Each structure stands twice: as structure tokens, then as C-alpha cells.
Amino acid sequence: MERKINVYLNRWKRDVSKKVLVIYGNKQVGKTYSVLKFGEKEYKNVVYFNADNNIELLNTLKREKTMEKIIMHLSLLSNESILTNDTLVVIDNVNDLEIINAMKIFGKTQELNYHIILITSLRENLKKFKCEELQFKAMNSVDFEEYLVAINNKQLIDFIKTSFKNNTPMPFHSVAMDYYDDYLMTGGLPEAVEMSINNSNKYLLNTIYSKVSDTYKKEIGTLDTLIDITRGLEVYDSIPYQLQKQNRKFQYGLIKAGSRSKDYEKSINF
């Protein structure tokens, strides 16, 4: 699937002043898939690390303080050569900020010849890092324009943009709305978009929704240093009921009887 992030990644690769790139966003929006596809297309080889519970990787990055030693040990850990300008190093599922912190050393060189991308679903804790040390790029779910490209309807995009630019009626408005309804059914999830294109049975999307929901719940379970896990899960489970109401104000009583704002404020803000 063609994603807008691809344009950014190609520009990043060719930027002589590039830094280590941190791509962040919700789980299941296509971060890893897009980065690996980019790597396969643009580099001689891709060296991939899954940082989730990877103690050896974490210890290496905490211990080594120079670019050369970090690269050498990453090469040893992966049993692959890391070539300047020809290898893409991908560190996925970065949940430990010490990994990101270790990458700041690469930002001290004028021209970075090692191409490194970190992928994380963390957002809030990234604010402490400076842009001169690292590059950050948010990646969101599939938007409506990307969806229309995926279903091979670029012409409709042109009609919409022209009508918007000229402030004129869109000649295929009802057609666009039908496609928009189909898009909303996917939730902007790449896997759901692919399934909706290749299978007319919309009920199969429920399996993807359930899988993604379970993934989010699992992630909430790892955030014990940031929020109360039990209350975080209660807030998450109440979202469908909150959205069904005519009144758009968040109602704490829908979480459970007797709920108060001060008990859930931290979880809701997160």
C-alpha cells in the first residue's frame, strides 16, 4: 500500500544533515511494514532488531559510548555487516527511553553515514529529546486520500482537491461519501483496508478490530509507571459507550457507577 510516509523516508535518506529517525505512532498503523518495505527498496541490506524485552540490545546501547562501538556491536548481535550509506538499521518496538537516549551520540556528527530508524508507540516521553540530536516523525493511520489510492481511485482525489481549491460543488459528492463510509469501516487500519479491498465480507473486519483492541489493552498493561493500569483499561473499555451517546461530553458514570473525574483524569489525559 502506498503511504505518505514513503515520501518523507526517501527525503530523509537523501538529506546530508540527517539524524537518527524516530518514527512514533499508535500500534497497527503500518510503521514497521512501511519502514521495512522502504529498506528493501532503497538499501542493499536491512538489519532489524526487535527491542521488546531484548536485554542484550539494551545493555549494549547503555554500555557503549561511541558510534563506532555501537555499530560494531549491533553488527555482532545481528551477525550482519552494517555498511555506511548502504545498510538500514531498524530498531522496532522501542519502549525503553534509554535506547533512544543512546542514539543521541549519532547526532553529534556533521554528516551521518549510518542510516538508523527507531520505531515506537511512545509519544509523551519523546518531548524531552531535542530535535538537534534526533529526528522525529509521527505516523498515523491510513487517511482517506491514502485509502482512495489503495482502491485505485486517484481521479476522485483530483475532483475533491479541485472542488476544495475553487470552492465549487463536487460533481461526484455522493460517490465520494459512499467511499468515505467504506473507509470509516476500516478505521484507517492498513490490515483492515487490505481486507476490505480483497474481501467483500465486511464482518471479517471484526477479527482485525478485536486483534487491534487486544494489542492496545496489552500495551496499557505495560504502562504501570505512567498510569493506573486497571483504571486505564476501564477508560478504554468505556470508549464505545461514550461514542454512542447523543451527548458528546465524557461521562464518568459510564466507566462504572460512582466514578469521579479525579480518579480517572490521569488515565484519560494519557
Question: Language-model features: where?
Answer:
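Conserved lysine of the Walker
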Residues: 31
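Conserved P-loop NTPase "ATPase switch" module shared by AAA+ and STAND
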Residues: 80-99
